[in-house]
Amino acid sequence: MNLLVVGSGAREHAIAWKLSSSSITGRLYCAPGNAGTAGLGINLDIRADDIPGILKAVLDYDIDLVAVGPELPLTLGLADRLKELRPAKPPLCFGPGAAAARIESSKSFAKSFMRRHGIPTADFRVFDDLGQASRFIQAPPWPFVIKATGLAAGKGVFLPDSPGEAEAILESLMLGKSLGDAGSQVVIEERLQGEELSLLGFCDGKSVQAMPPSQDHKRLLENDAGPNTGGMGAIACASPGALTRSQALADLFLLGACKGLAEEGSPFVGTLYAGLIMTKDGPKALEYNCRFGDPETQALLPLLDSDLGEVMLACARGRLEEYPVRWRQGSCATVVLASEGYARDSGPDVPR
């Protein structure tokens, strides 16, 4: 089969690295890829958010399976558009349609979704109006965090230490458009205390198989200081106890979300990722992502004992239950090398 990996980061290098040894892989392409993926397959000069360009490449290179790394092409409907290509032989996609991807692309949708389906999460309010949000933070019912509703590359969560700082954050997001349209609506939610955990799982729209538990480190500087980033490093552990715990959490947070999305007419295929926090009242979901985590993927895939191509194919065909995913015992860590000025100076044209 001809495979296409969409994305340009270290996450996509890890995916391409694993797919390069898959039994299903004939030719491997990356769009746009990077210097690392160039040694594994063929890089195509196509941006990850260039949906028409990707669709043309799928036809030109006779792609059978598309594995999408970042969230943006998914929210732009890449998986949906792929279904419209080659009616006689449509390419398969490891990644959800735009409707299911809203679980990441809209924090207000995700929070309301969790509430509808009984998934434990923090209390919250959603605001479109700066004045209403400003009045709320003057006498909030709980310590709070502020989240931009839209996609912000992991940099849309703010933990103010005072009402004045919170007001400045709201004005920057809602008036100054510091994150563009992503901050025009905000979620103000209860600030929970506890250790955070990244819970990822393979999903075929009906069932979920959990990956080992992992943990990313979001703060820019040493000793958990500095602003939040997309992640400066991650660890993962695949001991038998960790895998058992991970699957138990997945039954509530991942399978519950998978079933909820299917009930609402948006079945989820791909990697479903729940950001959890272990509170004194039990685990709660902070957020959902509709794709492999970055940098968690770089720590998880070296522990995967199964054929990643076969797993993706089983998910895309809705037959994951027939393919038990295996992990080798051990642990893995990854450290991010970031360009100067990250995360202040970041964007699609600025390498991390």
Question: Where are the regions that the model predicts?
Answer:
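ATP-binding N-terminal substructure of ATP-dependent carboxylate-amine bond-forming enzymes
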Residues: M1-P96
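ATP-dependent carboxylate/acyl-activation modules
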Residues: L4-V5, N223, K280, G330, ...
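General beta-strand structural signal in soluble alpha/beta enzymes
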Residues: V5, C30-A31, A67-V68, C93-P96, ...
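A conserved helix-loop-beta module that forms one wall/lid of the active-site cleft
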Residues: A88-G156
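Internal nucleotide-binding/catalytic subdomain
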Residues: G156-L300
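Active-site "cap" helix and flanking loop/linker of ATP-utilizing ligase/carboxylase catalytic domains
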Residues: A250-L272, N289-R352
